[in-house]
Amino acid sequence: MAKLVIPSDYDPKMTIRETEKAIRYIRETFQTEFGTAMNLERISAPMFVKKSSGLNDNLSGWEKPVSFTLHDGNEGELQIVHSLAKWKRWALKHYGFSHGEGLFTNMNAIRKDEEVLDNLHSVYVDQWDWEKVIDKSERTEATLRQTVQRIFETIKGMEYHVRALYPQAAYHLPEEISFVTSEELEARWPSLTPSEREDKICQEKGAVFLEHIGGALPLSKKPHDLRAPDYDDWTLNGDLLFWYEPLQRAFEVSSMSIRVDEDRLQEQLKLAGAEDRLDLPFHQALLKGDLPYSIGGGIGQSRLCMLLLGKAHIGEVQASIWPDEIVEKCQAAKIQLL
């Protein structure tokens, strides 16, 4: 299903070639500043993994990855990654990262089962996937919030860089970020859907880190949103959201979490009815204490470019596939799809 919101009197303010130059600048500058601020080292990342490894991201649990086999078939089924959430934790151990050190990657994924293609959602996903080694004693809300604050400040700093080069296009971001839990939103607006609650709180606060995503909420007995049970700790995770004036909606730029430890892994797999995953190599390594405790997440590259440049559609900052009807409507509205 495809949906399209067209801002009234939309003006892209930049030609396609100007936009392409700005995209390159944002990507190159942000990854350098982000890596420095977080003490992260860029490493190479796979586009596909073995299904049998258990390293692919199961997302909400029902999406099927694009898969294939090699000519001789000896490696079994290979899957295009949905994200590198579990692979990164394995890489921290494999590459010898120590406490306080971490990695980030340039992750490209295909999510063919994306339910709705709209201004923010594409079948093509590009993000900076990152992961950092922490101590078990640092598996706290304070650690999570300190990390969120550092990432928010890096994004805010990028606004100033972009404004200096492209003053006509730069989107203004709020000065501060607020922290709120999904339970608090449900208690405040019980009759609204989770996405409507996000819109409400983001319009009120400007920028929000929404915590506790994946576990059942007190009133509805349903999660605010689905999260895979084998990497995010549902009590120590969240989404970084901005109010986005051009589309009059909440705008997610990043999702992050302190990762499950041995106990939370088993608890959440049981709640999700997915205890069969415990036999997979990744999960066995985690249970045996062979993987480091970590915090990690993903920052959308196209999402960040779209936000900082005030674009109306993610197709203005990434090359993807869109239904003909969407392409025609975008052309009529001066939305320049790449």
UniProtKB/Swiss-Prot annotation:
SUPFAM superfamilies per UniProt: Class II aaRS and biotin synthetases (SSF55681)
BP GO annotations: L-asparagine biosynthetic process
Iron-sulfur is among the record's keywords: no
Domain of life: Bacteria
Pathway: Amino-acid biosynthesis; L-asparagine biosynthesis; L-asparagine from L-aspartate (ammonia route): step 1/1
Keywords per UniProt: Amino-acid biosynthesis, Asparagine biosynthesis, ATP-binding, Cytoplasm, Ligase, Nucleotide-binding
Subcellular location: Cytoplasm
Keyword Cytoplasm: yes
Catalytic reactions on record: L-aspartate + NH4(+) + ATP = L-asparagine + AMP + diphosphate + H(+)
Pfam name, any one: AsnA
Any one GO cellular component localisation term in the record: cytosol
Similarity comment: Belongs to the class-II aminoacyl-tRNA synthetase family. AsnA subfamily.
Family annotation (NCBIfam families): asnA
Protein name in the entry: Aspartate--ammonia ligase
Natural source organism: Lactobacillus delbrueckii subsp. bulgaricus (strain ATCC 11842 / DSM 20081 / BCRC 10696 / JCM 1002 / NBRC 13953 / NCIMB 11778 / NCTC 12712 / WDCM 00102 / Lb 14)
Species lineage: Bacteria, Bacillati, Bacillota, Bacilli, Lactobacillales
Gene name in the database record: asnA
